[in-house]
From Swiss-Prot:
Organism of origin: Arabidopsis thaliana
Assigned protein family: Belongs to the cytochrome P450 family.
Mutant lacking the gene: phenotype: No visible phenotype under normal growth conditions, but mutant plants have reduced content of the flower polyesters 16-hydroxypalmitate, 10,16-dihydroxypalmitate and 1,16-hexadecanedioate.
Gene3D superfamilies: Cytochrome P450
Induction or repression: By abscisic acid (ABA), auxin, the etylene precursor ACC and cold treatment. Down-regulated by wounding and in etiolated seedlings.
Membrane-topology annotation of the record: Single-pass membrane protein
Name of this protein: Cytochrome P450 86A4
Keywords of the record: Heme, Iron, Membrane, Metal-binding, Monooxygenase, Oxidoreductase, Phosphoprotein, Transmembrane, Transmembrane helix
EC number: 1.14.14.1
Length: 554
């Protein structure tokens, strides 16, 4: 009997070894270990995950396949992960075969408690209905105007005074935390018309904001542990699952009160025949005459919108300001562009008044080089560095890679912006000029499957234009007033999360910007090369010509 058991064990081990050797030959990418698959590599490289994935993709021509656990019957299905950054593969997944690559059950189960069947956590008809409904709102000028009001108010009354105080007291500030607070207030105001006041002197805590942060952190932890484990912890009430449950209760209570109050306000106005403007997203959904939405649906609309709009803009701006501190030439071009626009729109009689009000819509729209610098930041440091899809049915990607049903595909947005085959030999350099047309100085909208920072295809970010509006307004407000330097000894590194936060924040010192010196360097040229007209943006080596005033940045 013992001999039979021993022979059976030898047969199993031999069979597994032969299977493992065969599967190892066709898997490309990181080393795969017996049973453990690529998990040891993931653990070893966890502090530089995105760079590690990028290195593997470069070595494998833009696509590789690996298995998290090298177990028969799983390694080619649930355990198989295809990783790609090939633009043709991305277009295939995100557009051509969109229905074959949904969010999938893993993503939905992880975020269901927080986001329910909201637009960022749903597929199929549920997603399509919400997408169409939201798209109608995002195309309205009203929402853009509302965003502008919230952003400008936050900048003028809170954000800039906090920076000014820090400058006067020679105190460093964590710019990432401060911008995160500002964008949270802005997005909550736009989502449901409430001022959360997290970006205020003293940096006060807000119950809803704290609960939202805890709930997001607990939900993200579910990604890094097996499903059965977090399900068990939830059932037993252990660890962060306890925090998640309590935080969700606080969120539900807060939003229920907001929704109930808004319903009463709208009903009272309807009965009295009065009209008070409510241009937040929640009110616009509630005022639709053709639909009647449940409180749960409205709550999920607000939460999904906040999750999508808060972290992404703040993270992008943090990396933008860090890059600016290391590229003074780019900083100089941005400040000169801002000043050139303000010379035309506000004049030079009272330059000190330039900082009394944030830039308006028309002024922001003319900041072409600033938009290029922000886009270049997003290319190198996308707010969401990796995303994944579930494979519904067997398929073959354009590069010939077979992806079986039940497996998953991770597309690396981080790597997509760092490939020589897509962006050229200087792909790792911070070069805003790659976004500026050398012919007419206009902004170049690169193909969405090469530049995937705002996703692509049917799921492309609805709030892209609002995000640019907010980021450009905040960036212009800071750079017009201050010169930034990173605090000596402060280490800037990536935090391994679904969102590309800075692990230690961004500690900076602030110094007053000398606008008079910059304005003096802007020379009025009335030569044959300058004729009457409108601002023609940034031309060539950072030369911005404003044709109707004859002002050129030199």
């Amino acid at each position: 009997m013992e001999i039979s058991n021993a022979m059976l064990l030898v047969a199993i081990v031999t069979g597994y070894w032969l299977w493992f050797k065969r599967i190892s030959r066709w898997l490309k990418g990181p080393r795969v270990w017996p049973l453990l698959g690529s998990l040891p590599g993931l653990i070893e490289q966890r502090d530089r995950m995105h760079e590690w994935i990028t290195e593997n993709l470069r070595a494998c021509g833009g696509t590789y396949q690996t298995c998290i656990f090298a177990v028969p019957f799983l390694a080619k299905k649930q355990g198989l992960v295809t990783v790609t950054c090939d633009p043709k593969n991305l277009e295939h997944m995100l557009k051509t075969r969109f229905d074959n690559y949904p969010k999938g059950p893993t993503w939905q189960s992880v975020f269901h408690d927080l986001l329910g069947q909201g637009i960022f956590n749903s597929d199929g008809d549920t997603w399509l209905f919400q997408r169409k409904t939201a798209a109608l709102e995002f195309t309205t000028r009203t929402l853009r105007q509302a965003m502008g009001r919230w952003v400008n108010r936050g900048i003028k009354l809170r954000f800039c005074p906090i920076l000014a105080t820090a400058q006067d007291n020679a105190e460093p500030v964590d710019l990432q935390d401060l911008i995160l607070r500002l964008t949270f207030d802005n997005i909550c105001g736009l989502a449901f018309g409430k001022d959360t006041r997290t970006c205020a002197p003293g940096l006060p805590e807000n119950g809803f904001a704290s609960a939202f942060d805890r709930a997001t952190e607990a939900s993200l932890q579910r990604f890094i542990i097996p499903k059965f484990m977090w399900k068990l912890k939830k059932w037993l009430g252990l660890g962060l699952e306890v925090s998640l449950s309590r935080s969700l209760g606080e969120i539900d209570e807060y939003l229920a009160a907001v929704i109930n109050t808004r319903k009463q306000e709208l009903m009272s106005q309807q009965e009295s025949g009065t009209h008070q403007r409510h241009d937040d997203l929640l009110s616009r959904f509630m005022m639709k005459k053709t639909e009647s939405y449940s409180d749960t649906f409205l709550q999920h609309v607000a939460l999904n919108f906040i999750l999508a709009g808060r972290d992404t803009s703040s993270v992008a701006l943090s990396w933008f300001f860090w890059l600016i501190t290391m590229h003074p030439t780019v900083e100089d071009k941005i400040v000169r562009e801002i000043c050139s626009v303000l010379i035309e729109t506000r004049g030079t009689d009272d330059v000190a008044s330039w900082t009394e009000e944030p830039l308006g819509f028309d002024e922001i729209d003319r900041l072409v080089y600033l938009k290029a610098a922000i886009s270049e930041t997003l290319r190198l440091y996308p707010s969401v560095p990796e995303d994944s899809k579930h494979v519904e049915n067997d398929d073959v990607l354009p590069d010939g890679t077979f992806v079986p049903a039940g497996s998953s595909v991770t597309y690396s947005i981080y790597a997509a912006g760092r490939m020589k085959s897509t962006w050229g030999e200087d792909c790792l350099e911070f070069n805003p000029e790659r976004w500026i047309s050398p012919i007419d100085g206009k902004f170049i909208n690169h193909d969405q499957y090469r530049f995937v920072a705002f996703n692509a295809g049917p799921r492309i970010c609805l709030g892209k234009d609002l995000a640019y509006l907010q980021m450009k307004t905040i960036a212009a407000a800071v750079l017009l007033r201050h010169r930034l330097t990173v605090v000596p000894g402060h280490k800037v590194e990536q935090k391994m999360s679904l969102t590309l936060f800075m692990k230690n924040g961004l500690l900076v010192n602030l110094y007053k910007r000398d606008l008079q010196g910059i304005i003096k360097s802007l020379v009025v040229k009335k030569s044959d090369g300058v004729s009457n007209g409108q601002c023609n943006g940034v031309i060539g080596e950072g030369v911005a010509v404003y044709l109707n005033t004859g002002v050129a940045v030199v």
